[in-house]
Amino acid sequence: MSKVTVFGTGSFGTALANVLAENGHQVLMWGKNETTINEINEQHINSKYLKTAELNEDIEATLDIETAVAFADIYLMALPTKAMREVAQTIDSLLSSKKTFIHVAKGIENDTYKRVSEMLEDSISPKHNAGIGVLSGPSHAEEVVIKQPTTVAASSKSESVRQLTQDLFMNDYLRVYTNEDLVGVELGGALKNIIAVASGVISGMGFGDNAKAALMTRGLAEISRLGEKLGANPITFLGLGGIGDLIVTCTSTHSRNYTLGYKLGEGKSLDTALNEMNMVVEGVYTTKSVYHLSKEVNVDMPITTALYKVLFENRPVDESVKDLMGRGKKAE
């Protein structure tokens, strides 16, 4: 059995910490919220993110990052994309040996437009980096933590990291496939959040199944276009890290991206919607990154562009729908 430090005490990090503990691994979680840390240690719950779900009693948690760094040789990086670089740099400053980093973030960094594995490569010295991977796919934390059947993909440039990730997490309710296409798996996880926000918007506006089906299909098309341009295998987007994640995020009220979009579709402002949710919504930050990235690499992404204008230029949602439906005639 392995020792694993989970950096982050959000919903998915907590659910995966529970999987690891259930699989017999020693788990230490690190976070900054003292109330959450105390809850995990004393009550074996994380009420902020997973309500009353009972956690494995062997999971421990700490506020002290030095303790967290020293605990294990395997790190699960379960942090928002915008926090990843800073925490990784802090970890690197405390290391004296190589560690394996597995992340579960689904975003693209603002300004640099880098994927999370690239951010980690930037932040972790080669002398401290034993390998970087990602675990991604259709996996709501709320279902994983209560052991409902879930299937995901583990990807890395390193075959040994892919195998390690599969071995760590796979059990009778969490099935893990390996996938060599790190670029595609990361991009699929990040870009589907954009489409999920847009899916929430059209639901909030009262549109039906026809509109949602079209949005998801054309959303997958623009995800694939950008992915191919950036070196991904287009087949990846037909797998768990692509269409699998897209379906679950665009159709479920568990999805914070969908929920945010729904509030926007009802006519609420971005600030109001975010304040009501009081959670990180990766799709907002990813839309900003990908809008600018698509211009830089000259890839047509009309849904991303329309959502960017809603989020950051205050364009009314009904006008953005007209923009999309009124585009010039094209072949599919």
UniProtKB/Swiss-Prot annotation:
Q: Where does sn-glycerol 3-phosphate bind?
A: K106, G137, S139, K192, D245, S255, R256, N257
Cellular localization per UniProt: Cytoplasm
Biological-process GO terms, alphabetical: carbohydrate metabolic process; glycerol-3-phosphate biosynthetic process; glycerol-3-phosphate catabolic process; glycerophospholipid metabolic process; phospholipid biosynthetic process
Q: Which UniProt keywords apply?
A: Cytoplasm, Lipid biosynthesis, Lipid metabolism, NAD, NADP, Nucleotide-binding, Oxidoreductase, Phospholipid biosynthesis, Phospholipid metabolism
Which catalysed reactions does the entry list for this protein?
A: sn-glycerol 3-phosphate + NAD(+) = dihydroxyacetone phosphate + NADH + H(+); sn-glycerol 3-phosphate + NADP(+) = dihydroxyacetone phosphate + NADPH + H(+)
Active-site residues?
Answer: K192 (proton acceptor)
Residues holding NADPH? S11, F12, K32, K106, A141, R256, V280, E282
GO cellular component, alphabetical, reads: cytosol
Its main localization is cytoplasm
- What HAMAP family does this protein map onto? NAD_Glyc3P_dehydrog
PANTHER family the record matches: GLYCEROL-3-PHOSPHATE DEHYDROGENASE, GLYCEROL-3-PHOSPHATE DEHYDROGENASE [NAD(+)] 2, CHLOROPLASTIC
User: What family does this chain come from, according to its entry?
Assistant: Belongs to the NAD-dependent glycerol-3-phosphate dehydrogenase family.
From the Swiss-Prot or TrEMBL record, give the protein name. Glycerol-3-phosphate dehydrogenase [NAD(P)+]
